[in-house]
Regions:
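Accessory C-terminal segments flanking Radical SAM cores
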Residues: 119-173
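Basic phosphate/pyrophosphate-binding loop/patch that engages nucleotide-derived ligands
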Residues: 90-107
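A cross-family glycoside hydrolase active-site/sugar-binding cleft signature
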Residues: 24-26, 53-57, 80-82, 108
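Non-cysteine beta-strand/loop elements that form the S-adenosyl-L-methionine
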Residues: 75-87, 105-110
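Short beta->alpha connector loops
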Residues: 30-31, 57-62, 83-88, 111
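Acidic (Asp/Glu)-rich catalytic clusters
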Residues: 12-17, 67-75, 97-98
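A general structural motif
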Residues: 18-22, 49-51, 74-76, 102, ...
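Conserved alpha-helical substructure of the radical SAM core
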Residues: 1-54, 62
Length: 173
């Protein structure tokens, strides 16, 4: 997503909310974003007391730059590592390196891959929304589930016709 769009959205959220408890920078893979430092600084300028986290599968942490490590420490950012089964044995050395650099780390062991539950009948749409409770910000909208923003890509690229709609809120209206 475009940095200026995200910046505008964060500034707008600051106008609406005096504080946001937790903000997670997610992906894809946020460590692939060459502007990650800019995002961290901008978010902390607008929400200095928020619990800011970078959510990653950890693969790229072994090559994390000194500048990014400094930014993470200076801005009190936590690294949330989602450890998937194929990566369990590779994470110990990476986590050790981060902790030696005084980086706060949260480990979530993912025991198995979970499929995205999409069915055309959607017998329990409220349950689906309740179970997908991570508020997402994208291009001026808030939604309670990231599928609202990604389902069209899934449909277009995999020739599916899932009709997964839910309310999303325009933060500019």
């Amino acid at each position: 997503e475009d940095f200026e769009q995200v910046k505008s959205d964060i500034i707008r959220l600051r106008q609406i909310f005096s504080h946001i408890d937790k903000i997670r920078i997610m992906g894809g893979e946020p460590l692939l974003n060459p502007d990650l430092i800019k995002y961290i600084v901008m978010i902390k300028q607008n929400f200095p007391y928020t619990d800011l986290r970078i959510v990653t599968n950890g693969i790229l942490l072994k090559n994390i730059s000194k500048e990014l490590l400094e930014c993470i420490n200076e801005n009190d950012v936590m690294i949330d590592i989602s450890v998937y089964p194929p990566l369990v044995n590779k994470m110990d050395s990476i986590i050790k390196k981060l902790r030696e650099k005084n980086v706060k780390v949260f480990i979530e062991n993912i025991g198995k891959f979970k499929p995205i539950l999409l069915n055309k009948k959607r017998m329990y749409p409220y349950k689906e929304l309740r179970d997908c409770n991570c508020i997402n910000l994208r291009e001026g909208y808030l939604a309670s589930c990231p599928l609202v923003f990604t389902i069209q890509y899934i449909n277009d690229n995999y020739n599916n016709k899932y009709n997964y709609t839910t309310n999303k809120i325009n933060i500019y209206k």
